[in-house]
Amino acid sequence: RDRSVSRGLGDVYKRQILDLGLTLEYLETHGVTVIGYGTSELPAFYTRKSGFGVDYELDTPEQLAKAFHVKRELGLRGGLLVTNPIPEEYSMDKEVIDKAIAEAVEDAKKDGIHGKATTPYLLAKIKDLTGGDSLDSNIQLVFNNARLGAAAAVELSKLEK
């Protein structure tokens, strides 16, 4: 496993809320293929759309498992990142969340927040600014990702028997 990629992804995650284009550039540079689950557009954190494309769109857990399996069997380097849109009913209004993010980022700068304190600070500030709606969205995103990850893992286990 390429440790420089796994170490760097934490930094990318912190900046993800700020610059998805930069995140995609970083991932491409480090050989990480970005897959959209049921979408050709990279989902943003709180919304289903970002305006950025993904490398491939796959529509079933079976397809995801096959992609991981084939990559492993061929010994290809780099990673695969599956991006899974937030369920529609929990997607936030883009203007509302963009405004909250911008305000939270500005407050973080004013308060001298940096390093590993950045993500918790931003998430808490955005939660406050959205009256808790961002937390509800975040929780549903986690549940949705867990369901997809579990389904893909079941399918991958069938391929690797």
Regions found by a protein language model. Name each.
Residues 22-29, 45-46, 50-53, 96-102, ...:
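Short, solvent-exposed amphipathic alpha-helical segments in soluble enzyme
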Residues 79-144:
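A C-terminal functional module that forms or caps the active site or interfaces directly
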Residues 14-15, 32, 37-42, 85-87, ...:
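Short, ordered loop/turn segments at secondary-structure junctions
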Residues 1-13:
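Single conserved hydrophobic/aromatic residue that forms the stacking wall/gate
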Residues 7, 24, 57, 88, ...:
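N-terminal loops that bind phosphate or other acidic moieties
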Residues 7, 29-32, 41-42, 76-79:
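Short coil/turn connectors at secondary-structure junctions
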Residues 17-21:
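Short glycine/serine/threonine-rich phosphate/pyrophosphate-binding segments
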